[in-house]
Design a protein with these regions (language model features):
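Extracellular/periplasmic carbohydrate-active domains that bind, remodel
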Residues: 1-359
Length: 359
């Protein structure tokens, strides 16, 4: 595929002692580690190609921006591959304007962080697990104006338990983790935050496999609330299995609770497969094999799918106790025709879903 991603010049180039500047040309940066710092900026100017990856921990007011390219093509893409950029317990993180390509694993892994703003970035990833953005136990997150072509999930919102003893036992003196397994992610959320206040807007998503917009399934008994996806476009989705379907999905799992989750003003183009929307109970990726506790107040509004290959969407509770309560569906259309009930050819709603309103 040829991607043409024009952008306006950046005239506000930062200077100062806290700025690491990458000018035009190729820079072999290796692993950029940022720990216990305030006010650090990495600036990639137009024409810069920075080779490496980022690990940041306990940083505040951290900014990575510019018009350059951050590329991990020279990093390990085999066993023990790491995310392209990894942030743990950071406050007021901003990533803006850059293009990220060829991640070995997750592109942006953001754990236990508050006040995250991601704006106008572009991602191109081809490898399995090349998720675009994975938010784990984060709060107060705004994602806007992105273009993401990832092999795996584009945006996923999760929660894991903090296992500080594991972190301590596998941390080297320089702050890096000696366990390079991709599953180290499970142990990095040192603060077990509830997950709330997310807005993901004005984005273009292409997922070769997996979801475009996903809440769950990893939850560890944590509450998810006030999550809104709106004014986004889905170009591609191919996942069509019984466990992980849905360009937009809420996977109610792992003893978590899920409420006030909205998908609004979403255009889904003629995807190769999968479902437009799916909300269901599952124990996929549940640490103790548990399903979710409950979900309530899920909104689908102004959802337009045009195509013939998507399979019917699902909204499924599991039992009277493990139910979905409060679903609002307004102007959900398939090829221009409105979906007006939960028993037609495009949407299935089972008997464990209560208080459904079609507007």
């Amino acid at each position: 595929n040829l991607f043409i991603l024009p952008d306006l010049p950046d005239t506000a180039i930062p200077t100062g002692a806290n700025v690491t500047y990458f000018g035009p040309g190729v820079h072999n940066a290796g692993v950029i580690r940022i720990a216990n710092e305030r006010g650090r900026t990495l600036y990639l100017d137009e024409g810069a190609v920075v080779l490496g990856r980022v690990e940041a921990e306990n940083a505040s007011d951290l900014t990575i921006r510019g018009r350059g390219v951050f590329c991990s093509s020279q990093e390990n893409h085999g066993d023990g591959r790491r995310p392209q950029m990894e942030f743990r317990n950071c406050d007021n993180l901003k990533i803006e304007g850059i293009l990220l390509r060829d991640t070995p694993n997750w592109t942006l892994k953001i754990v236990g962080s508050t006040g995250v703003h991601i704006d106008n970035i572009k991602e191109i990833g081809w490898i399995m697990n090349s998720d675009g953005m994975d938010f784990i136990c984060c709060r107060n997150v705004l994602v806007e104006n992105t273009f993401q072509r990832n092999y795996d999930d584009n945006v996923t919102i999760k929660a894991f338990n903090g296992k500080t003893d594991y972190v301590t036992a596998h941390t080297a003196s320089d702050g890096s983790f000696t366990d390079a397994s991709i599953w180290t992610v499970y142990y990095l959320a040192q603060n077990k935050f509830d997950v709330y206040d997310y807005e993901i807007r004005n984005c273009v998503f292409w997922a070769d496999k997996a979801h475009n917009m996903l809440v769950g399934p990893e939850a560890r008994g944590i509450a998810f609330r006030n999550i809104r996806f709106h004014d986004n476009i889905v170009l591609e989705n191919r996942q069509n299995d019984g466990i992980y379907p849905g360009a937009m999905a809420v996977m109610i799992a792992d003893n978590g609770t899920f409420e006030d989750i909205a998908f609004e003003n979403i255009i889904v183009e003629d995807i190769d497969g999968g479902k437009v929307f799916c909300a269901h109970f599952t124990n996929a990726w549940a640490f103790d094999g548990l399903y979710g506790q409950w979900a309530r107040n899920i909104t689908l509004r102004n959802i337009a799918y045009t195509g013939t290959r998507a399979t019917p969407s699902w909204i499924r509770g599991r039992s009277d106790a493990q139910s979905i309560d409060g679903v609002t569906i307004g102007n959900f259309t398939v090829n221009g025709a409105p979906v007006t009930d939960g028993s037609g050819p495009h949407l299935e709603i089972n008997g464990y879903v209560r208080n459904v309103t079609f507007e």
